[in-house]
A protein has these predicted regions:
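Rossmann-like dinucleotide/flavin-binding elements
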Residues: 109-156, 302-358
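Short hydrophobic core segments
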Residues: 71-86, 121-124, 262-274
Length: 437
């Protein structure tokens, strides 16, 4: 699960085992070693691509090293796999001198520094990073005060319902492909609130009173119960600052409210990593078909790992220009309609996969180690695959329409956006994609 191509894990653990950060990094090294046995790999760590241009069937890359060296590379094809461009989170900048502001990227929640303290911890961020951090603190330091500032709240896919363990893999749970298919049938471009409620109530788990966010994160029911029982306080707001005034220390929130906290409290920045950096727009494939770009500004599938896998196959099959994939400017849409974002992305994924499945050899899908349906024994993924292939023509016949300028969804008016482009080569004059059967 979650690997490169069809390269298997070597941990020797049960399939339900959750790999640690170090084990994931070791697996990446293993994947590179396996790839080196198949093709020639030249490593240029410390180098960065500055620019590229195409001329006479050649792609010319200009690269620079960390020490200022220049290198020009000529190739027939170029794959720019920058992905989500995730960078570590810095600690939140706060005015107070009486708190300890840290980031889980630079401060181990189970490390000596945190262990030597017994002051309260404020976890800022209600997404998956916040949940994992809160869970680590609650289980590592029983009885310690741990608080959560959860923003507008988040719901998660229930690991127990999507990836049941043991014998339930044969008869329990629901395959992810089936959920995406149902999501694609339900979402019409205007009913994101209804779809969110259906998805949350049927396959989700959550601990906050409101759940305004969903980003495909997984959480088990036991993890959720442990966190909910171990939290001292949950505040549905956003931290703006921590200030010292009148002899006290206050957390200041976006709403204008404040909360007096104990001096020496820890503030842990868990505000997330995804779709935060404003990368410049770039189409997923160049006009010549020689350059493929894997990043969220022209997303064709829900995860950049899937994009890298399938777009690379289309590139080397010389079909990357022939298959009319839709692209989605994911960061742009998320800024303009966070509520509609995950369901638009899910519908887009099913539509594009329905086009890809008709354009590549079956082996491409059979060798895809990213396929989450592989969690289940062979008979179950096979039956879902048959349903998907049978339903592919229905997804392929979805059409684009204009969302009326006065339309409101989820109680909020929505401005025009260029977030979705059809076929990439001829962007439609309509501002928003509306899926219609």
């Amino acid at each position: 699960m979650f690997t490169a191509g069809n390269i298997k894990w070597t941990l020797g653990q049960d399939r339900s085992y959750l790999a640690t950060k170090d084990e994931v990094l070791i697996h990446f090294d293993h994947c590179l070693d396996v790839v080196k046995q198949r093709v020639q790999v030249d490593e240029y760590f410390g180098w960065a691509l500055e620019s590229h241009d195409e001329s006479d069937g050649i792609v010319r890359l200009t690269c620079t090293s960390s020490d200022g060296q220049l290198m020009v590379v000529e190739a027939k094809r170029l794959i720019k796999a920058s992905g989500f461009g995730v960078v570590p989170n810095d600690p939140l900048e706060v005015s107070s001198a009486r708190v300890v502001s840290v980031s889980p990227d630079f401060c181990d929640m189970r490390g000596d520094e945190m262990r030597a303290s017994d002051t309260p911890v404020w976890v800022v961020g209600g997404g998956k990073t916040g949940m994992d951090t809160a869970h680590a603190l609650i289980t590592e330091y029983p009885g310690r005060e741990v608080n959560l500032v959860a923003g507008s709240g988040t719901f998660f896919s229930s690991r127990d319902r999507l990836f049941p363990a043991g014998g339930r893999r044969w008869w329990g749970g629901t395959l992810v492909t089936g959920i995406f298919m149902e999501l694609g049938r339900r979402f019409d471009g205007t009913n994101e609130t209804d779809v969110a409620t259906w998805l949350r109530d049927t396959y989700g788990t959550w601990l906050t009173p409101t759940t305004g966010n969903y980003l495909l994160g997984l959480l088990s029911e036991s993890e959720n119960k442990t966190i909910a029982a171990g939290l001292t306080e949950v505040i549905m707001d956003h931290v703006v600052d921590a200030v010292d005034r009148n002899g006290e220390t206050d957390l200041v929130f976006r709403s204008g409210l404040a909360k007096t906290i104990q001096p020496g409290s820890w503030i842990v920045n868990c505000t997330g990593y995804m779709l935060r950096d404003d990368q410049p727009y770039e189409p997923y494939v160049s006009d010549s078909g020689a350059v493929v770009s894997v990043q969220p500004r022209s997303a064709t599938l829900h995860l950049t790992s899937y994009m890298g896998y399938f777009l690379t196959h289309l590139l080397f099959l010389d079909k990357i220009r022939d298959v009319p994939l839709y692209e989605l400017d994911a960061p742009d849409l998320r800024k303009k309609s966070n509520a509609a974002f995950p369901y638009t992305l899910g519908s887009l994924t099913m539509h594009n996969l329905s086009l890809i499945v008709d354009s590549v050899p079956n082996k491409v899908f059979l060798d895809c180690g990213l396929d989450l349906d592989r969690w289940y024994p062979p008979p179950r993924p096979t039956s879902t695959s048959i349903l998907f292939v049978g339903g592919a023509p229905r997804f392929a016949k979805l059409t684009c329409g204009v969302r009326s300028s006065g339309h409101t969804a989820g109680g909020e008016s929505r401005r025009s956006t260029k977030s979705v482009r059809a076929g990439r080569r001829q962007p439609p004059p309509v501002p928003v994609l509306v899926m219609r059967r």
